[in-house]
């Protein structure tokens, strides 16, 4: 079955092409740390031959606590992104939270991301669609895979079909997430075979029901990522940090930066294997 290709500059993203890595840090903590992390990702992905898009947030507008670090903000964040692009020649993905942010962010980065908690907000979807940028839609934890077609349709009505879908787990009772591996193929089907990627970092969140920040299961990142890659996906979304215990956001779910290369070697091996298989239709 023909898969839709979404192009991010010279990077082609599709379910049957070699996987694209969307990776970086959760939130911009400082200019220097962003440069350090981006440089490491670029070095490793170039060595392994993996297409790469740098990810970071300039504002974490949905933190659990009013006291949690949110990021440097729009103006300073765009300056850091511009420097990263000029220094390393990378493509960049970041999220927007308000309609007014869509165009200023799209003027700087290559992919704008619709956060999971906001994925059904029509005003935001319409503003993002109008930019003409490539869009990454995070599947809300409370939305079934089959409902993602409605969100894609909103973007199409707004004149933008350059949509990538991203799964980051589903609510499993209170304060826990699980990943339905059958959901990936459903998301492909309802979106017209749009590229589907897997955010393994945020799928590992596991909250303290009375805490002010998300916990996580970093020790299981490799096994969950291996399971997702075995489905046959367009890309993998992963956040890393040189010192996860002291990261300002989602450290408990972040891959230690020093483990990036061996981690990606495993992901590439699985992706190469799975996409080398002949298509097998077991529906009839």
From Swiss-Prot:
Q: Which GO terms describe its biological process?
A: keto-3-deoxy-D-manno-octulosonic acid biosynthetic process
What's the EC number here? 2.5.1.55
User: Which GO molecular function terms does the record list?
Assistant: 3-deoxy-8-phosphooctulonate synthase activity; identical protein binding
Q: Where in the cell is it found?
A: Cytoplasm
Q: Mind telling me which GO cellular component terms the entry cites?
A: cytosol; protein-containing complex
- Entry keyword annotation includes Cytoplasm: yes
Q: Which Pfam families match?
A: DAHP_synth_1
The answer to keyword Transferase applying to this record is yes
Q: Which reaction does it catalyse?
A: D-arabinose 5-phosphate + phosphoenolpyruvate + H2O = 3-deoxy-alpha-D-manno-2-octulosonate-8-phosphate + phosphate
| UniProt xrefs under Gene3D superfamilies | Aldolase class I (3.20.20.70)
Extract the InterPro entries matched here. Aldolase_TIM, DAHP1/KDSA, KDO8P_synthase
Q: In which pathway does it act?
A: Carbohydrate biosynthesis; 3-deoxy-D-manno-octulosonate biosynthesis; 3-deoxy-D-manno-octulosonate from D-ribulose 5-phosphate: step 2/3; Bacterial outer membrane biogenesis; lipopolysaccharide biosynthesis
Q: Which UniProt keywords apply?
A: Cytoplasm, Lipopolysaccharide biosynthesis, Transferase
Q: Which NCBIfam families match?
A: KDO8P_synth, PRK05198.1, PRK12457.1
* Family, similarity comment: Belongs to the KdsA family.
Role according to the record:
Synthesis of KDO 8-P which is required for lipid A maturation and cellular growth.
Description of how the protein assembles with itself and partners: Homotrimer.
Name by which UniProt lists this protein: 2-dehydro-3-deoxyphosphooctonate aldolase
Organism of origin is Escherichia coli (strain K12)
């Amino acid at each position: 079955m023909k898969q839709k290709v979404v192009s991010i500059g010279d990077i082609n993203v599709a379910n049957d092409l070699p996987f694209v890595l969307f990776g970086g840090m959760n939130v911009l903590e400082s200019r220097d740390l962003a440069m350090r992390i981006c440089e490491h990702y670029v070095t490793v992905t170039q060595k392994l031959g993996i297409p790469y898009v740098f990810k970071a947030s300039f504002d974490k507008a949905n933190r659990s606590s009013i006291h949690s670090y949110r990021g440097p903000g729009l103006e300073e964040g765009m300056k850091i992104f511009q420097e990263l692009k000029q220094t390393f020649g990378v493509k960049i993905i970041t999220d927007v939270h308000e309609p007014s942010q869509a165009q200023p962010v799209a003027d700087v980065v290559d992919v704008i991301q619709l956060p999971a908690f906001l994925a059904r907000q029509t005003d935001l979807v319409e503003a993002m669609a109008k930019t003409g940028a490539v869009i990454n839609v995070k599947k809300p934890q409370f939305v079934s895979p089959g409902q993602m077609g409605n969100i894609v349709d909103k973007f199409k009505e707004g004149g933008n079909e350059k949509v990538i879908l991203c799964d980051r787990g589903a609510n499993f009772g209170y304060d826990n997430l699980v990943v339905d591996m059958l959901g990936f193929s459903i998301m492909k089907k309802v979106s017209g075979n749009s590229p589907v990627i897997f955010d393994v970092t945020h799928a590992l969140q596991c909250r303290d029901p009375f805490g002010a920040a998300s916990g996580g299961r970093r020790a299981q990142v490799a096994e969950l990522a291996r399971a997702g890659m075995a489905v046959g996906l367009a890309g993998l979304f992963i956040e890393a940090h040189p010192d996860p215990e002291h990261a300002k956001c989602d450290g408990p779910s972040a891959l230690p930066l020093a483990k990036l290369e061996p981690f990606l070697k495993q992901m590439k091996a699985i992706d190469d294997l799975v996409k080398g298989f002949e298509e097998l239709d077991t529906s009839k």
